[in-house]
């Protein structure tokens, strides 16, 4: 799986992973992080999620990262935002108000950008990556965030033999292994969501849990 996989999904309109609402678990647990007002929050592999609008409404400076320029342009258009555009190395920044999206590869961003992020929200990034790429992603992104960072991570847990990802199953033991060495991942919620996600039952799943973690720099 490479960048072209996701670019093709956006071109073909196969974006069932996009939610037409703010993630309820974000709204429930984000206030518990007690992040300072005005701080920068990273939303990796953001697509055109409405979570970025919600985070900006909470007083944050939002930095999304997305490969597809089509997704980025749709986000600003659908939310009535006029973005300014500037080139930045191999990628492009789109900005409007308190929301900026870096259109490019997240691995091209270094500590000069990621180090300014005090918050992070990952609903769609870790579960979108194949297993071999997840440790590298976590080290690169979370290892370079502000030393004071706090964030939320949402994953899925299901029998991978019943369905091919993405989204992939990322169990608790894997989360702990991936983030060990730079971050603490504390499981704060786990719930069965299969009855609310019939499309996954149609793909053969008999069990589907969502897991919510509070992340912070390892003390």
From Swiss-Prot:
One of the GO biological process terms: methylation
Keyword Hydrolase attached: no
Catalytic activity: S-adenosyl-L-methionine + a thiopurine = S-adenosyl-L-homocysteine + a thiopurine S-methylether
Chain positions recorded as S-adenosyl-L-methionine binding sites: 10, 45, 66, 123
The keyword Cytoplasm is assigned to this record: yes
UniProtKB keywords: Cytoplasm, Methyltransferase, S-adenosyl-L-methionine, Transferase
Subcellular location: Cytoplasm
Gene3D superfamilies, alphabetized: Vaccinia Virus protein VP39
Molecular functions (GO terms): thiopurine S-methyltransferase activity
Gene Ontology annotations for the cellular component aspect, listed alphabetically: cytoplasm
Pfam families per the UniProt record, alphabetical: TPMT (PF05724)
Primary subcellular site in the record, as a coarse category: cytoplasm
Enzyme Commission number(s) from the entry: 2.1.1.67
Family: Belongs to the class I-like SAM-binding methyltransferase superfamily. TPMT family.
PANTHER family for the chain: THIOPURINE S-METHYLTRANSFERASE
Name the record gives this protein: Thiopurine S-methyltransferase
Native organism: Bordetella petrii (strain ATCC BAA-461 / DSM 12804 / CCUG 43448)
Upper lineage: Bacteria, Pseudomonadati, Pseudomonadota, Betaproteobacteria, Burkholderiales
Record gene name: tpm
